[in-house]
Amino acid sequence: MFQDGLLKGKRILVTGGGTGLGAAMGQRFLELGADLVICGRRAEVLEETAARFRSATGGTVTAVPCDVRDAAAVEAMMDRIWQAGPLDALVNNAAGNFIAETHRLSPRAIDAILNTVLHGSAYCTVAAGRRWIEAGRRNCCVLSILTLSALKGAAFRVPSAMAKAGVLAMTRSLAVEWGPKGIRTVAIAPGPFPTAGASQRLTPGGDDSAVEREIPLRRNGAHIELANLASFLLSDMAGYINGECVAIDGGKQFLSDAGSRTLELMNWTDEDWARMRAQATGKR
C-alpha cells in the first residue's frame, strides 16, 4: 500500500505501545522504516513486545516504562528518550474506559480515566512540544487516538467521552498555536477495533456480534487498517493535514439514533449492572 521507507528517518513514541492498538501501530511504523519508542506502565510487557518487534522487523525499538499520569515521570521519560536523539512524532494512545452508570461513579473512578487519557496526553504533548520548539525543530507531529465519543458523546462511558473530547480540543487548539512552528497535531477517532482488554470491559458477555450489527459495513475494524491510517498521518504525505480528526468506523458515526447498544444499556436492571461491574473488575 505504501512506498518502502515511508517513515524512514522518523523517530516515533507510542504511549500504551506494549499491547493492543498501540502495538499494532508500532509494528507498522517499524515496517515502514521508523525507529520506535514504546512506553507503558508494565516493563515486562514492553520488553516482550520490543523483542517481538525486533525479531519480526529488524528495526530499532526502545522500551521505556512510564506512567503517563505522572507529569514528573513523563518529563524523565522524555529526557531519557532525547539522550539518544529527538523524537519526530508522538502518538497519544494510552487509554482507559469502562461501562458504568454515571451517578454511581466515585471520584477515584473518574480520575482513573481523566488522569490517563486527558492529563497523560497533555503531559506528553507539552513535554514533546516544548523540546521541539526550544530546539527549533520542525516537521514534527502529534497524533492522538480518540474514540467516536469525542465527537458524539457516550452514555454510560462519560469519563472517557469527556477525556477524549478534551484531547480533541487540545488537538485543534495546538494546530493553530503550533502550526507556525512546524508542528502538526492530528487525531484519529476509531470505531470498534476489538482488543483483549477493551472487549472484556466494554462488551457484555464478550459477544461482538451486537456491536457489528450497529456498523453499516457489518464488521469491526482490523488493526492494520488503523495502523495504516496512522502511518499516513505521520508521514510527509500528510504534511498539509493539521487539526483534523479522521474517523475510521465503517460509517458508524452517521447512524441517526443513539444506537441499539445504548438503548439496550438504558434498559439494564441492577442485576445486569452488577454482572458488568464484576466482569470489568475480573470478579466472578
Model regions: which residues?
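Conserved glycine-rich cofactor-binding loop
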Residues: R11, G16-G20
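The beta1-alpha1 cofactor-binding region of Rossmann-like NAD(H)/NADP(H)-dependent oxidoreductases
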Residues: P65-A76, P107, I224
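Substrate-binding pocket helix/loop in short-chain dehydrogenase/reductase
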Residues: E101-T102, S106-L114, V211
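Active-site loop-to-helix junction immediately N-terminal to the catalytic Tyr of the SDR YXXXK motif
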Residues: L105, G153-A161, S173, G197-A198
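Active-site helix of classical SDR
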Residues: T125, A163, T171
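Short, small/polar-rich loop/turn modules that mediate ligand/substrate recognition or access, typified
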Residues: G179, R184, I241-G243
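C-terminal substrate-recognition "lid" of short-chain dehydrogenase/reductases
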Residues: R219-I248, Q253-F254
